[in-house]
Curated annotation (Swiss-Prot):
Name of the protein: GDP-mannose transporter
Keywords: Cytoplasmic vesicle, Endoplasmic reticulum, Glycoprotein, Golgi apparatus, Membrane, Sugar transport, Transmembrane, Transmembrane helix, Transport
GO molecular function: GDP-mannose transmembrane transporter activity
Alphabetical list of PANTHER family matching this protein: SOLUTE CARRIER FAMILY 35 (PTHR11132)
Span list, region Disordered: 364-384
Family statement drawn from the similarity comment of this UniProt entry: Belongs to the TPT transporter family. SLC35D subfamily.
Length: 384
């Protein structure tokens, strides 16, 4: 499944639930495995970094391509297709012995179902926000979720925020203000119906606000729910249950709340672009799996510190992809917003690294040393 993510930005203390994790790592090797040569391609740190960045850009661009259709309104159906593709992909990987995780358990599914509902809310509102906003603005505003999660940790888990982290939050808010101002300024000054364009942007900002609230609720709720499910292979199991449990819910929602008349289907899937749209929907589902694998690969062959910095730096190419592949306005204010948002991500990553180097006392749980590759990857499958 998509989202948003989210990322890179949500380092959660998993109470060491990731110990013994097998997610997106090769199945247990036979005794006395051979150590790969130092020059092995799979151990080249450049490749996983590029693959991780490419996967993130691919998922965002594919989602925007589908959602930017003239009248696309089958968002629940899009999310359902992505969930089905993700389940097929990870089950195929399990059958081939590439990954391992526990079989389905009704008791675990029952405990995890509330989190799945929060995830559906998160990815649906994220898809609506991305539908109305440009990729650069969407990427910039997504940073605000970090602030909500941080202070949620302060309120409910007894954490604290350092001065450098607080400074990065200020930059995130500033970049969002600049981005909104640049968008509205461009809409007013451009040709056409300025009122309609501003109205569209306002709808996007509202969906983005709701998405930030849903995302923070999902991440904070997931932190508490992990203790109930006792997931050891957390990352793959969370992805498995999230997608599997969401499929019937999304089928019901798309059947009841979306227009399945032949006219609307033709409007959403015009004959000239139908195959491309279907391909993009499938590829966007696969890309969430790619992100999970490549982020785990990145941590395995580099370090958690490198991974944190890559996550921060990755925001720039994602934002730029909106300028390259879509008609996002290229103005001085919009570029300034991207730069400030990019700097805020770097400052936040540096703040996390500094906190990880200090004793754990007085530090937010989300700022403790990053968890294993498997738990790291879950955050990235949430970005959209």
């Amino acid at each position: 499944m998509v989202e948003d993510k989210k990322t890179d930005d949500y380092t959660i203390e998993m109470d060491k639930m990731d110990q013994g994790s097998k997610n997106f790592e090769a199945a247990a090797p036979p005794p006395q495995p051979r150590t790969p040569p130092a020059g092995s391609i799979s151990n080249n740190p450049i490749l996983p970094v590029l693959a991780y960045c490419g996967s993130s850009i691919l998922m965002t661009v594919m989602n925007k391509y589908v959602l930017s259709g003239l009248d696309f309104n089958l968002n629940f159906f899009l999310l359902c297709v992505q969930s089905i593709v993700c389940i097929v992909a990870i089950q195929t990987c399990k059958s081939c012995g590439l990954i391992t995780y526990r079989d389905f358990s009704a008791d675990e599914a029952r405990k995890w179902f509330p989190i799945t509902l929060l995830l559906i809310g998160m990815i649906y509102t994220g898809s609506k926000a991305l539908q109305f906003l440009s990729i650069p603005v969407y990427t910039i505003f997504k940073n605000l979720t970090i602030i909500l999660i941080a202070y949620g940790e302060v309120l409910w888990f007894g954490g604290s925020v350092t001065g450098l982290t607080l400074f990065s939050f200020g930059l995130m808010v500033l970049s969002s203000i600049i981005a909104a101002w640049a968008d509205i300024k461009h809409a007013v000054e451009s040709t056409g119906d300025a009122t309609a364009k501003v109205s569209t942007l306002n709808a996007g900002y509202i969906w983005m606000l709701v998405n930030c609230l849903c995302t923070s609720s999902y991440v904070l709720g997931m932190r508490k729910r992990i203790k109930l499910t006792n997931f050891k292979d957390f990352d793959t199991l969370a992805m498995f249950y999230n997608n599997l449990l969401s499929i019937p819910v999304l089928i019901v929602l798309t059947g009841l709340m979306e227009d399945w008349s032949s006219a609307n289907i033709t409007r959403n899937f015009p004959p000239a672009d139908r195959n491309n749209i279907i391909f993009a929907m499938i590829l966007s589902g696969l890309s969430s799996v790619f992100i999970s694998y490549t982020s785990a690969w990145c941590v395995r062959v580099t370090s958690s510190t490198t991974y944190s910095m890559v996550g921060a730096l990755n925001k720039l190419p994602i934002a730029l992809s909106g300028l390259i592949f879509f008609d996002a306005p290229v103005t001085f204010p919009s570029v300034s917003a991207i730069v400030v948002g990019f700097v805020s991500g770097i400052v936040y990553a540096v703040a996390k690294i500094k906190q990880n180097a200090k004793p754990k006392t007085g530090v937010l749980p989300m700022s403790n040393p990053p968890v294993s590759a498997s738990s790291q990857s879950m955050r990235d499958s949430l970005r959209s």
